[in-house]
């Protein structure tokens, strides 16, 4: 489901991506990849509270991940 959410996001099918993402969360724990996708999805929809929650989780649980580095770049560039 996470892969389908990512593919949908990459194809700019954001509603489908959110659907797959939330179905994924019903059955799985967050990974760096799921937190990153959650940040992107929620940032796109303007949900600042969820973005902030996912940012805290990503930085706290996976500070050395590729996704945390992507987050830092996004924050440094002012995109988040």
What are these model-predicted stretches?
Residues 1-3, 36-37, 74:
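"A position-specific structural signal for the A-helix of alpha-solenoid helical repeats
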Residues 8-9, 36-37, 70:
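Intrinsically disordered, glycine/charged-rich N-terminal periplasmic/extracytoplasmic linker segments
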Residues 22-32, 36-66:
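TPR/TPR-like (Sel1-like) alpha-helical repeat modules
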Residues 68-79:
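Short, low-complexity, Pro/Ser/Thr/Gly-rich segments in the mature regions of secreted, periplasmic
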């Amino acid at each position: 489901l996470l892969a389908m959410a990512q593919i949908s996001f990459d194809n700019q099918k954001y509603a489908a991506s959110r659907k797959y993402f939330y179905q994924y969360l019903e059955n799985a724990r967050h990974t760096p990849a799921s937190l990153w996708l959650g940040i992107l999805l929620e940032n796109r929809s303007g949900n600042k509270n969820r973005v902030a929650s996912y940012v805290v989780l990503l930085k706290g649980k996976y500070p050395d991940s590729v996704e945390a580095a992507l987050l830092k770049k996004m924050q440094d560039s002012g995109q988040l």
